[in-house]
């Protein structure tokens, strides 16, 4: 599905079903340097069970036009604009990694527009490794290779992809290298490194919130996810064992089970 936000064309996957303004809206926000494709194993379920699923490509990513937004705050405002652009007054938000920073900030800024908030592999702050940041900003493909190595748990390194013939790390690498690294991953990493408002934003959130964390997450460890969740009144926490930061791909079925129980009840 394509539509315009602030004069630029936006692409969003609808999970294989036509968009219907009468159905409740769920917006999925991807992590640094990635695209809507990371959500392919979650969006389809909701699209076929009474929801509008929109897995968006952030500006400058995937199939969306424009330049990458340079701050988490800009991205948060953009998500709010997406809700308006598709003719809805509210949405449930689902974010992964950087997408958690974006959706936390968005929910704190626009509380009347957010019905529920689901965070995967989230933290209140995501300071970047200086070497990784430098590699990404200098368009070095090693940045993607390192990110994918750290982002997957031990099991994710050995296979287990639900689609026969695919490999978790190669799939993620392909997505991250689909656009110029310095203009996507480099910009996103810098935005994460600069963002300092996550904990204060979390304190303002009043809508039902779910945090899905993973025991083998090296990028946003469980303790950081719990710290963020503790600041959100009534936040639910679910921890997935033997899984890394890319839980939405490594353990797609387990993540979907938790997510659909939270959103649909």
Enumerate the language-model features and the residues they cover:
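Short beta-strand element of the alpha/beta-hydrolase
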Residues: 22-31
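Conserved alpha/beta-hydrolase "acid-adjacent" motif
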Residues: 218-224
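Catalytic active-site module of serine/aspartate enzymes centered on a nucleophile-bearing elbow/loop
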Residues: 235-265
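Short beta-strand/loop motif that positions the catalytic acidic residue
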Residues: 205, 211-213, 217
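Active-site loop/oxyanion-hole signature of alpha/beta-hydrolase fold enzymes
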Residues: 3-15, 40-48, 52-98, 257
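Conserved alpha/beta-hydrolase catalytic His-Asp/Glu region
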Residues: 134-204
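Flexible "cap/lid" loop of the alpha/beta hydrolase fold
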Residues: 101-146
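Active-site glycine-rich loops that stabilize anionic/oxyanionic intermediates
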Residues: 31-34, 97
């Amino acid at each position: 599905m394509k539509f315009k936000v602030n004069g630029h064309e936006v692409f969003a996957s609808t999970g294989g079903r036509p968009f219907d303004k009468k159905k409740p809206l769920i917006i999925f926000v991807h992590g640094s340097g990635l695209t809507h494709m990371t959500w392919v194993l979650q969006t389809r379920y909701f699209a076929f069970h009474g929801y509008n699923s929109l897995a968006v490509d952030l500006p400058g990513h995937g199939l969306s036009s424009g330049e990458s937004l340079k701050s988490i705050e800009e991205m948060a405002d953009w998500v709010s604009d997406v809700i308006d652009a598709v003719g809805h007054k509210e949405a449930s938000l689902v974010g992964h990694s950087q997408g958690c920073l974006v959706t936390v900030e968005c929910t704190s800024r626009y509380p009347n527009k957010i019905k529920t908030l689901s965070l995967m592999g989230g933290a209140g702050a995501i300071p970047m490794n200086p070497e990784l940041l430098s590699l990404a900003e200098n368009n070095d493909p090693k940045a993607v290779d390192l990110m994918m190595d750290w982002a997957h748990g031990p099991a994710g390194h050995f296979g287990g992809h639900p689609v026969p013939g695919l490999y978790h790390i190669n799939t993620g690498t392909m997505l991250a290298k689909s656009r110029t690294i310095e203009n996507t991953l480099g910009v996103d990493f810098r935005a994460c490194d600069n963002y300092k408002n996550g904990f204060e934003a979390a304190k303002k959130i009043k809508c039902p919130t779910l945090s899905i964390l993973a025991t083998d997450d090296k990028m946003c460890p469980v303790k950081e996810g719990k710290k963020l969740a503790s600041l959100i009144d009534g936040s639910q926490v679910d921890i997935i064992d033997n899984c890394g930061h890319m839980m939405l791909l490594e353990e797609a079925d387990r993540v979907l089970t938790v997510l659909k129980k939270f959103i649909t009840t």
